[in-house]
């Protein structure tokens, strides 16, 4: 075969690879925006990437100006508390004077039988937090009356690229690594080649162990109220993986994986046991939005329920990005949905 034919075949391969990648990322989807409710934008909170409700209806919000950090600005993130229905007046910065390098990501709350409330935060410091050394960390706090008291920092080499966390008590938790590689090149290859190299870790209060492997960008994580079922959102895998938890050993056994055909992100659970999942229907568009705020990224919210062998997936909210770009989380309390995103300078307080 002549040299030019090899060249033609090479370009055909590259073109086909690009088309497949864009198709897998949802770029050719036709989207029909809808929501049977009303949303109010709540300004003043930048990058409300994760939101979770306490049992009393107060929401805790993980906030960080990630674009500002990318541009080298000397800024830090924070945790807000928010009481829905007060038009933003119920918003309180729990770290107004923090000077440490605090860049929160996923969060989880555990409320014990004695009334104690504990918050775990995935943190991405560049120079450490609360006297911890550099690198990723899990920060544990006690929450009381709109104040946070830092209890400890947890670090380990297995925390390669932590994303989200779920406490099973005040000392133990599961955490996702959204990549298996810590290098930029390795992480880029994982994304575009859709490699399933990410994992879930379990921390027993002293040590980390790998609990699940072979996941396609393990992102949001949550657990059933009785602690028997663990849910993991795979953004690149576009599926929800459901694990049975051995309550004695906390080992995980994969029960099933359910296709969403969307880049699902954080998982919240309402009082009825329904999963609420923020999602990116067009993942490549979201990656462009990360670099350029003028590129709107569609926002999507699913409600997922499962009963024995049957399940139901309902798309509750879909917007092309005008109302909120790049939704990552939908936290629910009663008839209120709080929808957050990675970069926007507001979140949505919705009634449905």
What is each stretch, according to the model?
Residues 42, 48, 66-113, 118-125, ...:
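Blade-loop segments of beta-propeller domains
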Residues 58-60, 118-120, 172-174, 229-232, ...:
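Conserved beta-propeller blade signature
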Residues 40-77, 325-329, 342-344:
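Beta-strand-rich domains and repeat architectures in extracellular enzymes and scaffolds
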Residues 45-55, 98-111, 156-173, 179-181, ...:
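Beta-rich, blade/repeat-based domains predominating
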Residues 24-46, 89-93, 311-320:
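A short helix->beta-strand "capping" segment at the edge of beta-propeller domains
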Residues 61-75, 121-133, 175-195, 277-298, ...:
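Short, conserved, GDST-rich strand-edge loop motifs in beta-rich repeat architectures
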Residues 224, 260-317:
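Loop/turn-rich, solvent-exposed surfaces of beta-rich toroidal or solenoidal domains
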Residues 13-37, 76-84, 189, 193-198, ...:
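Blade/loop signatures of beta-propeller domains
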């Amino acid at each position: 075969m002549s040299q030019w034919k090899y060249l033609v075949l090479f370009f055909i391969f590259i073109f086909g690879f690009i088309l497949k990648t864009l198709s897998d990322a949802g770029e050719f989807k036709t989207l029909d925006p809808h929501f049977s409710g009303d949303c109010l934008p709540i300004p003043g909170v930048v990058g409300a990437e994760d939101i979770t409700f306490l049992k009393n209806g107060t929401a805790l919000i993980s906030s960080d100006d990630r674009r500002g950090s990318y541009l080298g600005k000397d800024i830090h993130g924070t945790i807000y508390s928010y009481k829905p229905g007060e038009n933003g007046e119920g918003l309180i910065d729990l770290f107004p004077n923090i000077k440490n390098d605090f860049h929160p990501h996923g969060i989880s709350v555990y409320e014990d039988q004695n009334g104690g409330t504990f918050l775990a935060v995935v943190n991405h410091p560049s120079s450490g937090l609360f006297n911890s050394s550099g690198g990723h960390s899990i920060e544990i706090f006690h929450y009381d009356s709109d104040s946070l008291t830092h209890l400890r920092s947890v670090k380990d080499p297995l925390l390669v690229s932590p994303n989200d966390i779920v406490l099973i008590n005040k000392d133990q938790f599961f955490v996702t690594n959204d990549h298996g590689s810590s290098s930029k090149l390795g992480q880029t290859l994982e994304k575009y080649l859709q490699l399933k190299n990410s994992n879930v870790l379990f921390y027993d209060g002293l040590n980390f162990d790998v609990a699940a492997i072979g996941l396609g960008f393990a992102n949001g994580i949550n657990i059933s109220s009785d602690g028997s079922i663990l849910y993991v959102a795979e953004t690149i895998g576009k599926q929800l993986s459901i694990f049975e938890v051995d309550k004695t050993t906390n080992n995980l056994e994969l029960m099933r994986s359910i296709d969403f055909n969307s880049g699902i992100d954080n998982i919240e659970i309402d009082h009825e046991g329904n999963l609420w999942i923020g999602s990116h229907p067009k993942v490549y568009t979201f990656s462009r939005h990360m670099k350029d705020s003028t590129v709107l990224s569609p926002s999507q919210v699913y409600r997922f329920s499962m009963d024995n062998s049957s399940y139901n997936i309902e798309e509750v909210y879909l917007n092309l990005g005008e109302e909120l770009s790049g939704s990552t989380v939908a936290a629910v309390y009663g008839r209120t949905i709080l929808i957050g995103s990675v970069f926007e300078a507001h979140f949505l307080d919705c009634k449905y």
